[in-house]
């Protein structure tokens, strides 16, 4: 596989899980394999539900020298519901995500917005225990990516409800980086 990737001039990418230490924690694992292998994969870091201790995973990867893309489930997943209304489409496994979450997040400093921190019960003691991206490693932060998983998209109306407003907010955030 590696020789095919190199021969084709491609770059191996994948969800962050491909570079995590295998353990009973599964997708909640916080320990990263430090080796870059011989194909220098780019992890798309997605699993960062608030208050689960993984909000800073993107910075850990970048500080280890991995080029990374933020695919933040608690801000950039368009299939997350914004509240508990049972008539809303969307899921809630990464919390309730509204437009403000996507707009307010600073991808290079996830805890910089005091309103978001308060909304998610994040205090300074919690923030002090997290990793920050080092200035010399900002170059490893390639950008942000949004997702719309379609388990709950049953027709065009649901697609429009989940996608259209979110993509506008996301585009504003992506263009401002």
Language model: regions and residue ranges:
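Substrate-binding groove of N-acetylhexosamine-processing glycoside hydrolases
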Residues: 2-177
């Amino acid at each position: 596989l590696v020789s095919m990737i190199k021969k084709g001039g491609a770059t191996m990418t994948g969800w962050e899980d491909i570079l995590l230490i295998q353990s009973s924690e599964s997708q909640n694992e916080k320990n990263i394999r430090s080796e870059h292998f011989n194909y220098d994969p780019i992890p798309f870091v997605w699993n960062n539900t608030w208050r689960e201790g993984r909000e800073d995973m993107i910075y850990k990867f970048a500080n280890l020298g991995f080029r990374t893309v933020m695919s933040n489930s608690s801000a950039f997943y368009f299939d997350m519901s914004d509240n508990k209304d049972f008539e809303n489409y969307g899921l809630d496994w990464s919390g309730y995500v509204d437009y403000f979450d996507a707009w307010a997040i600073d991808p290079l400093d996830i805890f910089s917005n005091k309103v978001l921190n308060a909304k998610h019960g994040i205090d300074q003691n919690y923030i002090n225990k997290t990793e920050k991206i080092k200035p010399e490693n900002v170059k490893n932060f390639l950008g942000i990516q949004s997702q719309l998983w379609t388990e709950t998209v049953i027709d065009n109306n649901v697609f429009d409800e989940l996608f259209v407003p979110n993509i506008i907010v996301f585009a504003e955030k992506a263009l401002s980086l």
